[in-house]
Amino acid sequence: MAEASVDLGTGDNLEQKILQVLSDAGSPVQIDQLLKKLQVPKKILNQVLYRLKKEGRVSSPAPATWSLGGDGASGDGAPEIPEDSAAQPSLEERILRFLETKGPQRALHIAKALGMTTAKEVNPILYSMRNKHLLTVSDTQMWTIYRSSQEGQERACSGVGQESPAVIYQQNPINMICQQGPNSLISISNSKAIQIGHGNVMSRQTICGDPGPGTPHHAPLPVLEDAAAQDTPPGTHGAQLIHLNKSMLRRVQLGHGNEMNLERDPVEHPIFSFSSSPPESTTTADPETAFNMQTPEPGPHPEGGTTQIVHIKSCLLEDTTVGNNNKMTIHRRSKGGTKESADSQELKEDTGASSEATPPRSCLHTPSDSTLLTSELTAMALGDGSPQITESMLREDEVQAAETCQTQD
């Protein structure tokens, strides 16, 4: 040990040993491993490491982690700056920029983007950023920015409250909708006239001419008005986790207290199929069906309570509301411009499915523990079956029938 102390005084022998250990490892090495192999005080080891980093001979891709070779940025790691303060802020900025560009990612993808090899190397900084409210992680281990990178850093420093989510305009056939908050990842494909959240209001009046035989009419997509963002304090309704896979969504509401007033196109939409087989009834026991919904009534909930969890797989949703106390009114307008009512036969023709595979219209309530699903859901309301709250989907000739059903409930 006396000889080792002499070598540390010069530093030459320690530098060679550090370079040899990093070269033999072939991947980033934690500071604890270096201390164990070199048997030197941590303070002296850090001094030599930062001197080598300044010379471009080693780099620090993560906090308390070192590798052989420079990082392409000379002079940014002065020895007098503590290790964590020098490496961690720079790495946080790189992670925030990566997620801001690429969207939600798994830890392994983030690690590879930073030049690392395993998720374990980046997990400590990810969870540290989550504790600072810079990042959030979903139940599927997808990491995303809590807000934007700049706003997230300002929030971590000043403790400013979370802003309401931005209004989302649907511009592509497949859209990624991310609510910037903890445990709120929503992924939806093939959406049209859709509302996500609580207390939304959508009203669209479409006057359809004669679009020609066999040509469906596609009106301009509406702008979503998030009334909950204005009237409801942040965090009142809690988190949402929604997965709708392989779903054709038309006029869909997700959340509580939404209201939608639309006019149905006179030309029937073509039947959409995700496979060559026709629609058929399925149950939650089938491997290709997934449904799980937990929707307490709107309002403050205990800490950790989840407001809405929806898993729907391989389902076509048309004129559908998911949540509590939603209201949807759909008017049918003929080619001549006059309104006409919709009946069960027209509803049946919309779906192209048998009466056995088509759920009843109007006051249909599916509880959260429902075991029956159809691969095509039309004019259907999904909720928690609460007797105090009614999910309604009304057509002009069904208002009276809906009121009767509500009384019976």
Curated annotation (Swiss-Prot):
A motif (RIP homotypic interaction motif (RHIM) 2) lies at residues 241-265. The Z-binding domains recognize and bind left-handed double-stranded Z-RNA structures, but not A-RNA, the right-handed double-stranded RNAs that are structurally very different from Z-RNAs. The second Z-binding domain (also named Zalpha2) acts as a molecular switch regulating pyroptosis, necroptosis and apoptosis (PANoptosis). The second Z-binding domain is essential for sensing influenza A virus (IAV) Z-RNAs. ZBP1-dependent necroptosis is normally inhibited by RIPK1: RIPK1 inhibits the ZBP1-induced activation of RIPK3 via FADD-mediated recruitment of CASP8, which cleaves RIPK1 and limits TNF-induced necroptosis. Ubiquitinated; polyubiquitinated following influenza A virus (IAV) infection. Phosphorylated. A motif (RIP homotypic interaction motif (RHIM) 1) lies at residues 183-207. Its main location: cytoplasm. Homodimer. Interacts (via RIP homotypic interaction motif) with RIPK3; leading to RIPK3 activation and necroptosis; interaction is enhanced by CASP6. Interacts (via RIP homotypic interaction motif) with RIPK1. Component of the AIM2 PANoptosome complex, a multiprotein complex that drives inflammatory cell death (PANoptosis). InterPro entries: RHIM, WH-like_DNA-bd_sf, WH_DNA-bd_sf, Z_dom, ZBP1. Keywords: Antiviral defense, Apoptosis, Cytoplasm, DNA-binding, Host-virus interaction, Immunity, Innate immunity, Isopeptide bond, Necrosis, Nucleus, Repeat, RNA-binding, Ubl conjugation. It holds the Pfam family z-alpha. It is found in: Cytoplasm; Nucleus. SUPFAM superfamilies: Winged helix' DNA-binding domain. Residues 337-351 have a biased composition (Basic and acidic residues). GO terms for biological process: activation of innate immune response; antiviral innate immune response; apoptotic process; defense response to fungus; defense response to virus; positive regulation of apoptotic process; positive regulation of inflammatory response; positive regulation of necroptotic process. Residues 8-70, 85-147 form the Z-binding domain. There is a cross-link at K17, K43 (Glycyl lysine isopeptide (Lys-Gly) (interchain with G-Cter in ubiquitin)). Residues 59-87, 269-307, 323-369 are annotated as: Disordered. This is Z-DNA-binding protein 1. Signal peptide: none annotated. PANTHER family: Z-DNA-BINDING PROTEIN 1 (PTHR14966:SF0). Residues 270-290 have a biased composition (Low complexity). GO terms for molecular function: DNA binding; double-stranded RNA adenosine deaminase activity; double-stranded RNA binding; left-handed Z-DNA binding; RNA binding. Key innate sensor that recognizes and binds Z-RNA structures, which are produced by a number of viruses, such as herpesvirus, orthomyxovirus or flavivirus, and triggers different forms of cell death. ZBP1 acts as an essential mediator of pyroptosis, necroptosis and apoptosis (PANoptosis), an integral part of host defense against pathogens, by activating RIPK3, caspase-8 (CASP8), and the NLRP3 inflammasome. GO terms for cellular component: cytoplasm; cytosol; nucleus.
